[in-house]
Amino acid sequence: VSIVKIARELEGAGWAGDRANWHPQARLTAMPAWQSATAEALSRHTGMLADLTAKGEEVDSDLKAAARLLSGVEGEDMRPRLTAAAEALNRYDSRAGRGLAATPDKLAKLQAQAVLFADWAEADRIDLSVQINQDVVEWPASRTDIETFYGAKARAHVAQQMLVAARLSEPRLARLPAVSAAFDRAELAWGRAAQMKPLVVSNQSGDGPFMANHLASIGFHLGEAQDASRNLADLLGDVPEGALENIAGLETRLAAAP
């Protein structure tokens, strides 16, 4: 997912933060906020994987490098950093596929992901609340309002895509009804936040016929996503050790039965 997200940003309109001051993209608000939040989210997710795969104090060099490159440095172009990060992630995936790199326990990884996503939702809700409750609100929204909205939307998109990928990579989760239902709820909640597409971001009172409060709306969806992610993490933590392996063994025996 991380490699695909990086490729989409680089192969699309390009990285807005790298543009010269005269370039039209340098004057945008939503796109730079989206891209910056996406890179930050991927960096934190990669850092989480590095922590889960660490052996003592030894962290996988490729994961460590990717997390550092994705975090960005002010004043430095992101395109070469993103390219190098994608290469590092690809090297790790290649080594892991050949059994040459440490990989995290699947349930532990899924649980850590859910906790991370819940933390994102909580932090974004706080930032959104600060903007919503400003004493003086610009019409229809300030630059900071727009940046806060699209930062939250970008993280929601990353979380939703990661959850979808997690289920595809571990189909045995469908054999655990409570966990499967919790995944459904989390995917739906994050998807609602990620799919908001206002023509113009508005941070108004919401009582007018045309201008809604989009910051409040995405904050509501993030509240549901936070609760769903916490619930998913709790349920994954309650899954008995070896449960997925037992399911695989049962399916093998059933397939071999006459």
Q: Residue locations for each model-derived region?
A:
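Short, well-ordered, aromatic-rich surface patches in folded extracellular/luminal domains
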Residues: 71-116, 212-236
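Ser/Thr/Asn(+Pro)-rich, low-complexity disordered segments
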Residues: 1-18, 117-125, 242-258
